[in-house]
Regions:
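C-terminal motif of bacterial Sec signal peptides marking the signal peptidase cleavage site
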Residues: 6-9
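N-terminal alpha-helical interaction modules that lie
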Residues: 11-71, 78-107, 122, 138
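Extracytoplasmic/secreted envelope proteins and their assembly/folding machinery
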Residues: 72-75, 113-116
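Secondary-structure-rich domain cores
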Residues: 112-113, 124
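Short acidic/histidine-centered micro-motifs embedded in hydrophobic/aromatic stretches
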Residues: 73, 133-136
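Sec-dependent signal peptide recognition
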Residues: 1-3
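Boundary/linker segments of alpha-helical solenoid repeat arrays
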Residues: 63, 123-134
């Protein structure tokens, strides 16, 4: 009937991807990314790294995979040597428990390269952009 159709078509739709964090609260991927890129602080960087890890490690949404570009963004961020130093010096104990390694200078670049490769695996169309990035950054 028309009523049934209207009720089912007006229901909540599921998101294709999980973007991490609290949706109606303050901490969302969008807010953290904006704050970090607008005025990066050690705290904003540490929070964003942990948000990326949550999104990549716990893919949700109807597709059950990280959103397009997230692995590439996160991987690139981990390949910046200063970010490993900042994380080691400023991350909270809880944030540091996100990763098994305490040697961030070695762990971050390895994981960064893996994430760039994962972006290509999940989204083959990204290879044209990501492959030269890997070649340039992961010598």
């Amino acid at each position: 009937s028309l009523v049934t159709f209207c009720l089912t078509s007006c229901g909540l739709t599921s998101s294709l991807y999980y973007w991490g964090g609290v949706q109606n609260g303050a901490t969302t991927y969008e807010n953290l990314a904006y704050k970090n890129y607008d005025k990066q602080t050690p705290e904003s960087l540490c929070k964003l790294i942990c948000m990326y890890e949550d999104i990549v490690s716990n893919p949700g949404g109807t597709r059950r995979m990280p959103p397009p570009g997230i692995c590439a963004e996160y991987g690139y961020m981990l390949l910046i040597p200063e970010n490993a130093t900042i994380f080691a010096e400023h991350a909270t104990a809880m944030q540091k428990r996100t990763f098994d390694s305490g040697d961030y200078a070695t762990f971050f670049p390895e994981k960064g390269k893996e994430l760039l490769q994962k972006e290509i695996e999940l989204y083959p169309e990204s290879a044209k952009f990501i492959t030269p990035l890997i070649e340039r950054l992961c010598k």
